[in-house]
């Protein structure tokens, strides 16, 4: 079970939102690259970046911050003899040129969310053009998919869309319960497992992690197809210690991802 720190970018800073509300942003660092280094030193094996401005604007808005993070990751990997530390990014990615540019910059995975729901043809083309590097981010409330930075609720059932996108060839699904994200109310295990059981590709849980008990609960259902969990407010506010939580997850699942070698 992989614990993936989230670095949410707004106006070049690292922030956390409550339930996707841009007006409820807490700035945790004005230096995103330094924040990336911090999580790597705490044992992170993968990083999750979100361009919040981009998610609302529909185009990249924090590219310089992303590049600085990627540079920090490269330097850390080289210094420690690590072959690769994957970095994934979502927010405002609406065309193939943007995907190609980001991948050329050094990102391992591109997360497509709203654009996948609104323009499935784009997702299909992206999966074909960049096999193994496209992740779909599905944000849902009460089983219905939300779009546009969570500001709009669609009529699509999350499982139906996930199956469709799996057929397109996406690498994995990030499932966020937006009723719980940033609120630390515990992961929606039941909904996450239900989604994972319906797919053959991995599901990454997101939203609601509060403490080590949430991590242990996810580890207990990892075999249902849950690859990891994205951690945000809990690791920033200290209710979850990333290093000890990852160690505990490794102990419970009796494995360590290759990037830790």
Curated annotation (Swiss-Prot):
It comes from Janthinobacterium sp. (strain Marseille). Signal peptide: none annotated. CDD domains: HisA. This is 1-(5-phosphoribosyl)-5-[(5-phosphoribosylamino)methylideneamino] imidazole-4-carboxamide isomerase. Its main location: cytoplasm. One of its GO terms (biological process) is L-tryptophan biosynthetic process. Belongs to the HisA/HisF family. It is found in: Cytoplasm. Keywords: Amino-acid biosynthesis, Cytoplasm, Histidine biosynthesis, Isomerase. It catalyses: 1-(5-phospho-beta-D-ribosyl)-5-[(5-phospho-beta-D-ribosylamino)methylideneamino]imidazole-4-carboxamide = 5-[(5-phospho-1-deoxy-D-ribulos-1-ylimino)methylamino]-1-(5-phospho-beta-D-ribosyl)imidazole-4-carboxamide. The active site is at residues 8, 139. GO terms for cellular component: cytoplasm. HAMAP family: HisA (MF_01014). Its EC number is 5.3.1.16.
């Amino acid at each position: 079970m992989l614990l993936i720190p989230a670095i949410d970018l707004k106006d070049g800073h690292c922030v956390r939102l409550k339930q996707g509300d841009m007006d409820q942003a807490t700035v945790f660092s004005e230096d995103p690259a330094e924040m990336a280094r911090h999580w790597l030193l705490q044992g992170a094996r993968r990083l999750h970046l979100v361009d919040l401005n981009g998610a609302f604007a529909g185009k990249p808005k924090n590219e310089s911050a992303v590049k600085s993070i990627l540079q920090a990751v490269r330097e850390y990997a080289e210094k420690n003899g690590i072959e690769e530390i994957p970095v994934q990014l979502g927010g405002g990615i609406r065309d193939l040129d943007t995907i190609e540019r980001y991948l050329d910059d050094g990102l391992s995975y591109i997360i497509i969310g709203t654009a996948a729901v609104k323009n499935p043809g784009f997702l299909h083309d992206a999966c074909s053009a960049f096999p193994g590097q496209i992740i779909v981010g599905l944000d849902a409330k009460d089983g219905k998919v939300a779009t546009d930075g969570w500001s709009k609720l669609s009529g699509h059932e999350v499982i139906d869309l996930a199956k469709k996108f799996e057929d397109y060839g996406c690498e994995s699904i990030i499932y966020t319960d937006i009723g719980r994200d940033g609120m630390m109310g515990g992961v929606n295990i039941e909904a996450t497992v239900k989604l994972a059981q319906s797919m053959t590709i991995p599901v990454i849980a997101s939203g609601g992690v509060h403490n080590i008990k949430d991590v242990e609960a996810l580890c207990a259902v990892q075999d249902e197809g849950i690859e990891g969990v994205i951690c945000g407010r809990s690791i920033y506010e200290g209710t979850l210690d990333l290093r000890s939580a990852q160690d505990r997850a490794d102990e419970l699942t009796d494995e360590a991802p290759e990037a830790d070698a």
